[in-house]
Amino acid sequence: MATMVPSVLWPRACWTLLVCCLLTPGVQGQEFLLRVEPQNPVLSAGGSLFVNCSTDCPSSEKIALETSLSKELVASGMGWAAFNLSNVTGNSRILCSVYCNGSQITGSSNITVYRLPERVELAPLPPWQPVGQNFTLRCQVEDGSPRTSLTVVLLRWEEELSRQPAVEEPAEVTATVLASRDDHGAPFSCRTELDMQPQGLGLFVNTSAPRQLRTFVLPVTPPRLVAPRFLEVETSWPVDCTLDGLFPASEAQVYLALGDQMLNATVMNHGDTLTATATATARADQEGAREIVCNVTLGGERREARENLTVFSFLGPIVNLSEPTAHEGSTVTVSCMAGARVQVTLDGVPAAAPGQPAQLQLNATESDDGRSFFCSATLEVDGEFLHRNSSVQLRVLYGPKIDRATCPQHLKWKDKTRHVLQCQARGNPYPELRCLKEGSSREVPVGIPFFVNVTHNGTYQCQASSSRGKYTLVVVMDIEAGSSHFVPVFVAVLLTLGVVTIVLALMYVFREHQRSGSYHVREESTYLPLTSMQPTEAMGEEPSRAE
C-alpha cells in the first residue's frame, strides 16, 4: 500500500539531493526506459493530477514515485504503477524509478501550475484632478503565476494606457496620465492577463473594480461680486456673484453671506459661467460696516470675492400737525423729526442739530387752507449724503365768501340774449351758492348759460351758505328791452305791403278783362280806335287827359 508523504517533511533541497543520488552512472547504460505520463503537464493551482509510470523491463521490481506533493498509489502491476497527486499548489518535478536487472531506471516530468491573481486593485484616484496636470494610475497585483505569462494592463474606458509584465510579488504597475476635460467622469481600471495559450489553455483575464475620475478647471481670478454700497435696515437688495471659465460649473458650490448671515442663493450655470443670485435683507442688529462675501468652491479649491457694505437706519422724516384740520384764527404747530444723525429742514428752516426736530407755528387763515409743509432729511453714510422728503397738508375751516371780483354786482344785459352769471363762492366746507330775486322765489342759475328776458330784470340776493355761516351779495340785473316804435313801424310796413299787393292784383285783373272785349274797325278812319265794351262806359268815366 502506497504511503502519503507530506511535502512539509521533505524540504525542497532534500528532494533535489535524492534525485541526484538516484541518477547513478548505471543509468546511462540502461537498456530499458521508464516512462512518466503525462509529460510536463499544466494545471491550475490546487488541482489533482493522475500520473502513470511504466517500463518494458521484463524483470522490473516495484516502481516508486518520488515527489514533494501529496501522492497516493492508485493501482500497480507488472512494469507499471499509477499515482494520484492532489492539491498541487506550485511548480514541481516528479521522478519515477525502478530496478531492472539490478540497475535503476528513472523517468521524470515537470508539473507547471498556473494561478490567477488573488487581488487586482487600482489604487484610489484623487477626489478632484486639475485639468492639465499629471496624475498617476497605480495597480497592485497579488499572486498569480507563472509570472512570465502574467501581464498588467491599465485602462481608461476600454482604451489601453499601459501594458507591463508583472514581475515582483506583489507586483505594482504605474502609469502617468495628463488630465483633460474629457477625463471627467471617465472610469479607470486595471486588468491582468494570464496567457496560457501556448500550453493550450487560453487567456485568463481578471479586472479590478473601476474608479471614476473627476477633473476640474478653476480660474485664478476671483468672482465678480455686484452688491450695494449701502443697505437700509429692513430693506432688501439683490446680490449677484459671477465666475467665468469654470468646469464643470454644475458641480461648483457657492456661498453668499452678509456678514455672518448666510444668503439663500439661486445658482445658474451656462456653459463655463456660473451665476449666483440672492437677496440681502439687513437686520437692525447689523447696522454699521459689514461685508458681502461670495465663495465659489470646486475640486477642493476656493475663489473668494468681498465687497464692503454699510447697513444704516434712516427713520423719517415724519411731519406732524398739531391740528390737521384747524379753525380759522387758531394756532397750529408744525413739527418734523427723523432718526439719530439725521438733519431735518422744515420749510427751509433747519433744525438746531442732527437728530433734533424742527418746528414752526402759525395762526391759521383762509389762505393757509390746503397749504403744504415740506420737510427734507439728510443722512451722511460713509461719505455719501442720502436725502428724503416728506410733506403734510393743512386744512383750515372758514366761513363762506363770494369773490366780488368774479361776481359783478351790476349787470346790463339785453332782452332775449344768452348769458352766464359768473359768481363763485369759497369756504371750507365748500358752500352752496344760490341767487334769488327779491320779492319772489325766482332763482337764476349760477355758472350755467341761460336765456335772458325782461322778466329777469331786478335785484337778486346771491347767498353762499355752509355749516360755518352765510354770506350774501346783492346783484342787480338791468335788462334792456327793444325800441318802443318798433312794433308800429313793423305793422305799418306790413299794411303798406298788403295794400300794394291788393292794388297790383286789381290792376292785373282789369287789364285781363280789357284784352278779352269786342272791337269794331271803322273804314273811314286811318287809325283804329279801340272802344271797350266793359261796363266802364256805362259808368260815364272819361279818359284822363294831360293838361
Swiss-Prot record:
Modified how: Upon stimulation by a physiologic stimuli becomes rapidly and transiently phosphorylated on serine residues.
One term of GO molecular function: signaling receptor binding
Membrane topology, Cytoplasmic segments: 511-547
Glycan-bearing residues: 52, 84, 87, 101, 110, 134, 206, 264, 295, 308, 320, 363, 389, 453, 457
Domain Ig-like C2-type residue range list: 46-103, 132-197, 234-301, 329-382, 416-469
Alphabetized InterPro entries for the sequence: ICAM (IPR003988), ICAM1_3_5_D2 (IPR048679), ICAM_N (IPR013768), ICAM_VCAM (IPR047012), ICAM_VCAM_N (IPR003987), Ig-like_dom (IPR007110), Ig-like_dom_sf (IPR036179), Ig-like_fold (IPR013783)
Record's keyword terms, sorted: Cell adhesion, Disulfide bond, Glycoprotein, Immunoglobulin domain, Membrane, Phagocytosis, Phosphoprotein, Repeat, Signal, Transmembrane, Transmembrane helix
Main localization (coarse): membrane
Residue ranges, Extracellular side: 30-485
Intrachain disulfide bonds: 53-96, 57-100, 139-190, 241-294, 336-375, 423-462
GO biological process, one term: phagocytosis
Subcellular localization(s) per the UniProt record: Membrane
Family matches, as SMART domains: IG
TM regions (residue ranges): 486-510
Membrane topology: Single-pass type I membrane protein
Leader peptide range in chain numbering: 1-29
Tissues expressed in: Leukocytes.
Any single Gene Ontology cellular-component annotation: extracellular exosome
Family: Belongs to the immunoglobulin superfamily. ICAM family.
Assembly and binders: Interacts with moesin/MSN.
Protein task: ICAM proteins are ligands for the leukocyte adhesion protein LFA-1 (integrin alpha-L/beta-2). ICAM3 is also a ligand for integrin alpha-D/beta-2. In association with integrin alpha-L/beta-2, contributes to apoptotic neutrophil phagocytosis by macrophages.
Full protein name: Intercellular adhesion molecule 3
Gene: ICAM3
